Amino acid sequence: MFKIHFRFFFSHGGTEQVHNYIVKTPLNNVLAQRRSKSYRRSMRSCVEATNLGYTSGHLTVLRIPRSRRTPKSRDITKQVDPDQVALLVRKEWELSYVTPLYQFRHTQLKSYSKHLSAFIVSEKQQGLAIEVGQELGFKVNFSVVLGLAETDEDAETVFIQILSRQAFAAKDDAQKVVWSGWLTCVNGDLEFLRSLPSEFVSLPLLCTRGPESLTVLVKSWFEKTFDCCFGPLGINSANLQWLAALWIGCHPTINIQYLKLVWTLPTLPPMDVKYTIHPQDAWELWDSVRQDDTTDVSIEEVTRFIKGLQSHFFRHFRIELSAGSLKQVSTALGSSHHSGKIKIASPTYITTILQLLTECALLKMPI
């Protein structure tokens, strides 16, 4: 028998209520539930749901993982420049998937910086709205973030910044960053990456931050230059559950401070339920559903953990959270929203999160 401290917040029909509770739960109950255009056309012709990747000569099946490695605490700044790490963490990013880039070369980043800058200025001169004020011009910086790649097949991360100076700024005023984005691949599917033709580079995950109009221009330039295509990358309920479990698994080495889950229930009008659990209680529940002390976490363990939380809630409120959809997960280590937004608050477990997002991007691609 152990206790779970949790806070319950719900909004329904414009009314909001908050409740705090301590509930005792028997452990055995939880345990019982325990590149050419022809290449792009050929990719688009595949059905997304099949998760088949077109490569030169054969189809590669991209399988949904049923287990993942337990998170390992690691000082990423020993591998990656701390200044570059600071650019990635403690910011909210919008996620997209990217199909393989044709003839992309990490050695040509300086040239790409000039060409993208000229493209943005050209589009602005044609009267396209940029929505970042009255700027004199744009400067683009491409750079490589060395050290995030986990395997030899992973391409190194590319970081992009767009800077601009306001029209009425003093001459010596520094340009300010108006848009940021990065393309990455962390522990990508080896079979898929190895089967790509040598002319293609796979950086399937794009994270962006800034005006949507600039995001559209950046994507447009990439599509024209590297014959690729982009799409929104939402994070479904199953992957949000994975994130919750992986973050809870970090608690023994770093205090996650809280676990907040948001469900949307299919009522009229829809009801949002915000469910905040004390981190130690969440960890004890997680520890109780773990089958053994292995280095892997299985989907069955994640399912039992979420069902355990749902059973706590149902026992007290008679509200069946499983009837709804998990929309958001938050801890002190980061947060994620089903619409495709992610915030990584700590660099300690950044590779664990990026690996999961890389998998999501590869599975989402229409190839």
Region locations from a protein language model:
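N-terminal low-complexity/intrinsically disordered pre-sequences and tails
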Residues: 2-192, 341-367
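Internal, hydrophobic cores of structured domains that mediate oligomerization or house catalytic pockets
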Residues: 163-247
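Generic recognition of long tandem-repeat/solenoid scaffolds
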Residues: 156-168, 261, 275, 324-344
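C-terminal, charged interaction/regulatory segments at domain termini
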Residues: 5, 303, 307-367
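Intrinsic disorder
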Residues: 103-110, 154-156, 202, 209-216, ...
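Conserved beta-strand elements of beta-rich interaction domains across eukaryotes
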Residues: 165-167, 212-213, 266-268, 282, ...
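Terminal interaction module
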Residues: 227-327
